[in-house]
Amino acid sequence: MRLSRLLIGASLGVALSSTAFTAALADVKFGSLYPISGSLALLGEESARGLELAVDEVNAAGGIKGEKVVLERGDAVDNNQATGEARRLISLVGVKAIFGTYSSARVIAASQVSELAGIPYFEMGAVADEVTGRGLQYLFRTNPTAENMAKDSVDMLIKGIAPGLGKDPKDMKIGIIYEDSSYGTSVAGHQEDNAKAAGLTVVLKSGYPSNTVDMSSLVLELREKGADVVMQTSYQNDSVLFLQQANEAGYKPLAIIGGGGGYSMQPTADAVGHDLIDGVFDADYTQYAVNTSATPGLTEFVEAYKAKYGSQPRSGHSLTNYVGAKAIFQALNAGEGFEPDQIVSAVKALDIPDGQTAAGYGVKFGKNNQNERATMMGMQWQDGKLVTVYPENAAIAKMRFKK
């Protein structure tokens, strides 16, 4: 009897070990590399939530090629740590690909590591030209770019804001200010180029460190130059600082156009007050107050977000990362496997038409592995909410102008 029990126990142990081993084989590990601490943590965490929701969705549907997706997280608090975390995820954890990263500077640093290792890197939030401009073989970007953001800023000024103010856009003076990392520099450069190509007047283009604690001299310079339109590309803290110090100085340009970042965040509006931010424009990723006929799946995304995190999404960064990750997962599910070249082949074959994602744009990788169908939208803060006002097919409100 005792021997029988031992044999049964041994057999059961082998069976359980075999099951555990099989389960381990049925997991595919991906890296999730975002700034989740430090000055970029708020938008980094918001971006990571989109990836997490895409993973939840694909796992609920049976995983990718029958394998459960497991996210291994890394904290890209600065460029050095982004590089170190990429090495750890690849060498020690053994991830098949890395997803991230929100910050242009962080992904530029980290993707050098993945490229040398031959591991695919999917960027779903950083906009700087240099992200894809280096011609890396294993880096793909699903989201819109700095050029998209700049073009939408200028187009919105010419086609909507200037007519709404009763102005000829060529009579308006534009001041371009920006945080001086790869993100802000790229957007500002394209804004200047687009404005000048359209015959508009740029009276100031000036960068500053994103961690600045005083923008009063920049406010004064804008005022002295007579800038009646300000385009600012910024993170949250510098968005708040500029709006507050411009208000304190009594500087009231006819229009402020944010370039995503802090201008797309509800916490920014709450920090400066709804009376102050109302009327401010923003060119950025698809947000939530939008015509949902142009963004199929957006309502379901918001419901899933609220169920998991207990609040409304804080910006469109989570949505953009969700859409990007979901598209990549779709490609991998149709692919041959998880070896680097198999992953690259699968995503290069991806072809999602416009109007079939929750962000509204399609996905197809073109030159330098950039999603050539990615686009941005134009929003305005109205009654404390960021609502879509441009383009017309996605708008749910008309532009408002203060008298």
Swiss-Prot record:
A UniProt-annotated Pfam family: Peripla_BP_6
Keyword check for Glycoprotein: no
Swiss-Prot/TrEMBL GO biological process terms: amino acid transport
InterPro entries named among the record's database cross-references: BCAA_transport, Leu-bd, Leu_Ile_Val-bd, Peripla_BP_I
First and last residue of the signal peptide: 1-26
Family the entry assigns: Belongs to the leucine-binding protein family.
Role description: Component of an amino-acid transport system.
Protein name: Leu/Ile/Val-binding protein homolog 8
